């Protein structure tokens, strides 16, 4: 099973449509759960702490937690597919923080810190990118045409 915990709601229809498409495609390979948590507009420190508490409340004790962060490890699509294949039995939980990042308590709970790039992406777009890469990983794992 793959779970994605993310702060913030998807607002744009075209992002919602893309996410629905990848959710449909992924249903062939794995159970997928997406948990959207509210983003807060407090001062930055309080916001990170509150979002962190909400994130941790959605993580199960046995989940293999992957935080997505700019200073995490970069993987190729092939290496990400190896990583997912190796850890899928452990219920992989990907965590996308709010605009101010992740709390230290969430980072402490992380089993693996992953970065897709040193670039900064809008959270709505990044969620689509993440689902596409997870889908690509399953295509690679199953030796199916898609990845080049």
Label each region the model flagged.
Residues 1-26:
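N-terminal beta1-alpha1 ligand-phosphate binding loop
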Residues 8-13, 39-42, 71, 120:
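Short histidine/acidic/glycine/proline-rich micro-motifs that form metal-
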Residues 15-19, 45-49, 77-81, 107, ...:
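Conserved strand-to-helix beginnings and helix N-cap segments that scaffold or border functional pockets
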Residues 21-23, 82-85, 111-113:
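Glycine-rich, phosphate-binding/catalytic loops in enzymes
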Residues 30-31, 36-93:
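S-adenosyl-L-methionine/SAH cofactor-binding core of RNA-modifying enzymes
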Residues 97:
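Rossmann-fold NAD(P)-binding glycine/threonine-rich loop
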Residues 101-105:
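Short, glycine/polar-rich helix-capping loops at beta-to-alpha or helix-loop-helix junctions
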Residues 106-148:
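Structured adenosyl-cofactor binding patch, chiefly the S-adenosyl-L-methionine
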């Amino acid at each position: 099973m793959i779970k994605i915990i993310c702060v913030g709601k998807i607002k744009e229809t075209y992002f919602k449509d893309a996410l629905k498409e990848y959710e449909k495609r992924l249903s062939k390979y794995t159970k997928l759960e997406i948990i959207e948590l509210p983003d807060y507009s407090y001062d930055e420190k309080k916001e990170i702490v509150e979002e962190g508490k909400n994130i941790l409340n959605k993580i199960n004790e046995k989940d293999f937690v992957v935080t997505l962060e700019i200073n995490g490890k970069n993987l190729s699509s092939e290496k990400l597919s190896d990583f997912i294949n190796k850890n899928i039995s452990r219920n992989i939980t990907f965590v996308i923080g709010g605009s101010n990042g992740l709390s230290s308590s969430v980072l402490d709970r992380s089993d693996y810190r992953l970065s897709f790039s040193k670039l900064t992406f809008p959270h709505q777009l990044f969620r689509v990118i993440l689902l596409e890469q997870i889908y690509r990983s399953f295509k690679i794992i199953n030796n199916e045409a898609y990845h080049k």
